[in-house]
Structures are given as C-alpha cells and as structure tokens.
C-alpha cells in the first residue's frame, strides 16, 4: 500500500475538518480541490484533471466520486473512503447524488468548495439541479485553512522538497554557459531534482533566456543561452 502519512495523522486531519464543519453548521461537505482530497485520503496521482469530488459526512465513511478507470489506483492508495466510479459518458452529478443519498445528506446543509479550479460551472449546476432539498453552503476555505498549520512530519517533507529544489537549482546554474540550450539546462535541473527524491513536478521548471525573461509561465523552447544573457 502506498502511504506517506500514518493512519493516526489522517484520522486527526479528518477530526479537525469535522470540527470545522460543526462550526460552519453543515452536515457534510463536498471537496473539489485535489490538494484537499489528498490531505484527507492520500490519493496521489495525475488523474485529478478530471472530476474528483470527495463527500465528507459529519460521521461515517467518506465517499470519493471520480472516473471508474481510477479504481485500481484508489484501491492501492486509499483506505478510509469508498469509491463511486463513473464512466466517461455518464454525468458525475448522478454519482454525487448517490453518495449524498447513501450518507443521508439529501435533506441537509452541505458545504461545497465553490472557489475551485476543478469544479466546472456545468457540474456545479447539474449537482444543484439534482439536489433540490439540499441547502448548499460555500465552504471553500474550510480544509485549506487547516492545511496552513503543518505537522512535524509535514515539515520534514517540506524540508526534503526544499533540498530537491536546491539540487535542481544548483544543477541548472552549473550547466548554463555560452552556447548551452535551455533543453540541456532543463534536463540537468530535472535530473538533479528527481535524483534528490523529487516526485513529478507540480510546476515548471521555468528556465528562460533574456528574450523571454518577462514571460511568467513558459518553459524550455530549444533556445540557446548567450554570453551576457539575463536568465530566469
């Protein structure tokens, strides 16, 4: 089983979330932010670009709604929630309704993370239309606020991530010279970070010559560094 944090830490996180749910006076919440889903379940993969919604009741087992093809990943990684998998030609909202029904939340006050890049307007409208008796509340910051305070084990991982980042930065700096391509530099940066224990990168790396210095979010393009270049 893939695991980073012990069961006790995950249990404490869930207790903290439920405490905040009580303060918000909601009977359940629907989590749509991938980082928040990971925070409670440890589901760690790249399928989060598609629908992922975690239903958290005030008591009882959580339910994750996502694509059916993610079942094996879910079973390998998640031990504290149930899996409701939908086919790609089905409306995920129907599975959210089933999850809410299973957890007896169809006549309740339920929070949802509205301020999420991963909840489309179409899906939100479909969920709302199919749950006329649910009183929906915006709980966008409920879980995110708890994540700000790190546990000792989380801090250890932050330090490990910083060391991997340092390794990548130093490798990039050392590989830059007149005539080097940003392909070479980016490859050395990535190699060093992965060798230092990094998993897949959340962003970047961003390595740019003078000609693209002001482009905030562009990566390597096959350009060649020249003597005197300012480099990001």
Where are these regions (language model features)?
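N-terminal accessory/capping or targeting/presequence segment of soluble
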Residues: 1-98, 163, 167, 221-223
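Flexible, acidic/His-enriched mid-domain "rim/lid" segments that flank
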Residues: 9, 14, 20, 91-201
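Acidic, glycine-rich active-site loops and adjacent beta-strand->loop/helix elements
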Residues: 34, 114-116, 210-212
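Short acidic-glycine loop/turn motifs at beta-strand connectors
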Residues: 56-61, 132, 209-211, 226
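Generic preference for hydrophobic
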Residues: 64, 83, 136, 206-207
